[in-house]
Regions:
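Residue-level detector of alpha-helix initiation sites
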Residues: 44, 48-49, 73, 144-146, ...
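Cysteine/selenocysteine-centered motifs that mediate thiol-based redox chemistry or coordinate metal-sulfur cofactors
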Residues: 438-495
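FAD-binding core/adjacent interface of flavoenzyme oxidoreductases
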Residues: 5, 22, 35-39, 43, ...
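Mid-to-C-terminal Rossmann-like scaffold of FAD/NAD(P)H-dependent oxidoreductases
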Residues: 37-41, 47, 319-425, 478-492, ...
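A Rossmann-like FAD-binding core segment of flavoenzymes
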Residues: 64-65, 110-126, 133, 205-302
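FAD-site-proximal beta/loop scaffold in flavoenzymes
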Residues: 155-183, 256-264, 269-345, 436-444
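Rossmann-like NAD(P)H-binding beta-loop-alpha module
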Residues: 170-224
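Beta1-alpha1 glycine-rich phosphate/pyrophosphate-binding loop at the start
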Residues: 37-108, 202-224, 426
Length: 497
């Protein structure tokens, strides 16, 4: 690796600033190489967070040849940050996972092309331009594609999802058509999930009227419990969004130029618009693998080591489907955090240290306009019979805390947070250790991660629990830096034990 210079320094990872030290020669001196893995050619299909993280961690441990292939873009970027480019908060270059110099200096080769076919017998890829590419080990990290359900008119200009960089570019072009309509300007968004509400906020930031069609009787109610879902319903409408629940798309019609002009609903309503956003979920992007011989279901089937049915082929990220997911986890998790973890895990295995994928306690976060959302652990939309819940909501209706716990013994199982930030390490420790709800409430200030001078709500939450359960639990102390540091220090010592 004499041609690869040592690189130290900070790197922008999406909207997170992290320090990565790529001191390869030093790391090699401290990492025992496996002779069987020397000099391999590793090909990664996809350059999202899963594929990029796999490449990064393989490079930190080995000098294998690494080639990344993506049809979508030359420069890997943070998909979750695309909305902020449209809203003017970021420039496109700010979404790049790494600086421009990162790839060459770390000897990561990139090819911008589509993979048409995988030949598992020849260990060869056939690319769109007719070229072939051999591999010793293959990592499939090809992500997802937006769902379409055969609606009439779904191929008209101005009808799209929001997943790829090209979608953002198309959305910018459609915005010109919307604004040209003057007082008749309107965007219609179909689908009550995270991408749908992101798209609504994007148009709202440019003062474009939005109609939001949600099939369910409340926003994202297959994930959020009723109280939180209703809070977001209100919040969406507070922003002037025309939220229509229990409403489905039936047809999209266009004008003579092939552009969307109207949307028809199941209630017979006709909504004039210049844009129709289809945000009804995503599916693994695996059509090119149908004839490969690799076992598929909804996604690419993998075991706990992220191995597919074929030797030397792995799958990670949105396209991977675990055959036996851990308790509390789904077989397919199209989430940034899981893609990142999968990339690091498969890198360990490829570098000779076979490592099972153990994602741990479920975590996710999102933002609904002005309300931040976090979930740790098991907080289903419908409370199971073996659980109880403590739900507190601020009178203003924009903040809430939910803590689920077992009826027998009171062990805490999950946290749902709206507009309030809790420390992930603290919540996960309580869940892992099956800490009783009473002990959690006594020490709830340790979890609060809001800035120091923000108002704290632990006393109100505790008072509500006491009223509901006729108890007299009290906070053990106020939050302090020293207490939180000691708690996290103990956590670190236990993890290293």
């Amino acid at each position: 690796m004499s041609q690869c210079r040592q690189v130290n320094g900070p790197i922008l990872l999406g909207t997170y600033h992290v320090d990565i030290f790529c001191t390869f020669e030093v790391q090699h001196a401290h990492t025992q190489k496996n002779d069987q893995t020397k000099g391999m050619k590793i090909v990664i299909i996809g350059n999202g967070i899963a594929g990029t993280n796999a490449a990064r961690f393989i490079r930190k441990r080995t000098d294998h040849q690494i080639i990344m292939i993506s049809e979508e873009s030359w420069q890997p970027y943070s998909r979750t940050a695309l909305m902020y480019v449209y809203m003017g908060h970021l420039k496109l270059k700010d979404t790049h996972l790494y600086e421009d110099w990162f790839w060459e200096k770390n000897c990561l080769e990139r090819i911008q092309s589509r993979v048409n076919r995988v030949d598992i017998h020849k260990k060869q890829l056939q690319l769109q331009d007719g070229k072939t590419l051999e591999y010793d080990k293959l990592i499939i990290a090809c992500g997802s594609r937006p769902n379409k359900f055969g609606w009439p008119g779904q191929s008209l200009k101005g009808v799209q999802g929001l997943y790829h960089l090209q979608d953002l570019e198309s959305m910018e072009g459609s915005t010109l058509d919307i604004l040209a309509a003057g007082k008749n300007a309107r965007a219609v968004i179909v689908g009550g999930g995270l991408i749908g509400i992101e798209m609504a906020e994007m148009f709202h930031s440019r003062h474009i009227p939005v109609t939001f069609l949600v099939r369910e009787n409340s926003f994202w109610n297959q994930v959020l419990p009723p109280e939180e879902s209703d809070m977001i319903n209100r919040h969406i409408r507070e922003h002037g969004i025309d939220l229509r629940l229990n409403t489905e798309l039936k047809e999209i019609t266009g004008d003579a130029a092939g552009k969307v002009s109207e949307v028809y609903t199941n209630h017979g309503d006709r909504i004039a618009c210049q844009f129709a956003g289809l945000t009804v979920g995503v599916s693994p992007n695996i059509d090119f693998l149908q004839e490969s011989g690799i076992k598929l279901n909804r996604g690419v089937l993998v075991n706990e080591w992220l191995e597919t049915s074929e030797k030397d082929i792995y799958a990670i990220g949105d396209c991977a489907e675990l055959q036996q997911p851990d308790s509390g986890r789904r077989a397919i998790e199209a989430v940034w955090y899981t893609g990142r973890m999968m990339g690091q895990t498969v890198a360990q295995t490829i570098c000779g240290v076979k490592t099972a994928y153990k994602p741990g306690i479920w975590f996710n976060s999102a933002k609904f306009f002005d309300i931040e959302y976090q979930v740790y652990g098991d907080v289903p939309a419908v409370l199971p019979a073996h659980l109880e819940t403590l739900y507190w909501e601020h009178p203003e209706g924009r903040k809430s805390v939910r803590i689920n716990f077992e009826k027998n013994g009171g062990a805490v199982t999950g946290f749902n947070l709206m507009g309030v930030r809790y420390r992930q390490e603290v919540c996960e420790k309580w869940i892992k250790e099956r800490t009783p709800i009473s002990q959690v409430l006594e020490n709830l200030s340790l979890a609060n991660f809001d800035p120091e001078f923000f108002r704290q709500y632990e006393s109100e939450i505790l008072d509500q629990y006491n009223r509901q359960n006729n108890t007299n639990i009290r906070l053990s102390s106020k939050r302090s830096r020293n207490q939180v540091s000691r708690f996290l220090s103990n956590l670190g010592q236990q993890s290293n034990a």
